[in-house]
């Protein structure tokens, strides 16, 4: 007798397996969804860039606004003349002892007319020298009057900007050298607290201390002040010459409303010693003398009492 065969329900088993797998998959998805926390929504907003003023600090080393070309707060790219701006941030990086040192990297400007001397800020702009009564140095848009030896000199630590405008400027500034002009912008009061004290020492017995304070005088920022000062002494490169300078610049601002402000600026400076202001010929410096020797780098051709003060 042949053995009987038992029927195997293959299709039923497959259906059961599919149903079980689907159920397990659904349970795992449900469990995963239950475990994962709900994601929070993050909203990102872009803050507007700080508005730069032609009389205030620049957001970066490269300034975008200037008042030298039009005497108004104007973007530099809209001024039809060539303008270069050296900001206070750039001066802090280079630590110049004079404005002409701060302008030593400015195109079209020659500052080494008297070697290492910092007695005056005499510049040659586009080949035109301006000194004495024809000097083209301005402070806050006003010409610094002088007569060569009593030319006014502003310390770079007191400035927010030093701006060079190249080319003829007599339409805006009257009598001037055709090469261009230098306009310096003083530091002005801020409503944000500013507290800075510096001590500096360097070669040639350089010692300098300075301070810069500014803040609002009331909660609304209607009244604000700024007080900047320094004291510096150093030996010049030449023997027997010394530099001494004391300066202070109090400033006060009144802002009755958002569109109106009155700023009082003052500057006091005393220089008991103005340093060396001479020059040496090519013979003996660049080229040797007939005996084959050269003058020492600290040679001073002037007399021991050939000094003067300025204030």
Segments (PLM) and residue ranges:
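Acidic/polar loop-and-plug regions of large Gram-negative outer-membrane beta-barrel proteins
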Residues: 232-236, 248-255, 259-311
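Flexible, active-site-adjacent loop/turn segments at secondary-structure boundaries
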Residues: 74-77, 89, 152, 170-171, ...
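Short secondary-structure transition/capping segments
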Residues: 123-127, 238-239, 275-276
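Outer-membrane beta-barrel translocator/receptor signature
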Residues: 146-148, 157-160, 171-248, 254-262
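Cleavable N-terminal targeting peptides that direct proteins into the secretory/outer-membrane pathway or into
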Residues: 1-38
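Transmembrane beta-barrel outer-membrane domains
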Residues: 116, 152, 202-206, 241-245, ...
């Amino acid at each position: 007798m042949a053995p009987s065969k038992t029927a195997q329900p293959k299709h039923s088993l497959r259906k059961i397996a599919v149903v079980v797998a689907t159920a397990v998959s659904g349970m795992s998805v449900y469990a995963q969804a239950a475990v994962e926390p709900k994601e929070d929504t993050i909203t990102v907003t872009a803050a507007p860039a700080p508005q730069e003023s032609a009389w205030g600090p620049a957001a970066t080393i490269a300034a975008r606004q200037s008042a030298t070309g039009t005497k108004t707060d104007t973007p530099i790219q809209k001024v039809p003349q060539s303008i270069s701006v050296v900001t206070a941030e750039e001066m802090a990086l280079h630590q110049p002892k004079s404005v002409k040192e701060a302008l030593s990297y400015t195109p079209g400007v020659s500052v080494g007319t008297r070697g290492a001397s910092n007695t005056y800020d005499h510049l040659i702009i586009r080949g035109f020298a301006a000194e004495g009564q024809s000097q083209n140095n301005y402070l806050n848009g006003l010409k610094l009057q002088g007569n060569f030896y009593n030319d006014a000199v502003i310390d770079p630590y007191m400035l927010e900007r030093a701006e060079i405008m190249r080319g003829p400027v007599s339409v805006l500034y009257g009598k001037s050298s055709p090469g261009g002009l230098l306009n310096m912008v003083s530091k002005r009061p801020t409503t944000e607290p500013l507290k800075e004290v510096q001590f500096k020492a360097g070669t040639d017995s350089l010692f300098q201390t300075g301070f810069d304070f500014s803040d609002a005088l009331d909660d609304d920022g209607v009244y604000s002040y700024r007080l900047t000062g320094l004291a510096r002494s150093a030996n010049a490169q030449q023997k027997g010459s010394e530099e001494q300078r004391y300066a202070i610049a109090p400033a006060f601002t009144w802002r009755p409303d958002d569109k109106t402000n009155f700023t009082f600026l003052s500057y006091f400076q005393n220089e008991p010693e103005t340093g060396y202001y001479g020059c040496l010929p090519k013979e003996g410096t660049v080229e040797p003398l007939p005996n084959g020797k050269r003058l020492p780098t600290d040679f001073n051709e002037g007399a021991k009492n050939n000094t003067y003060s300025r204030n």
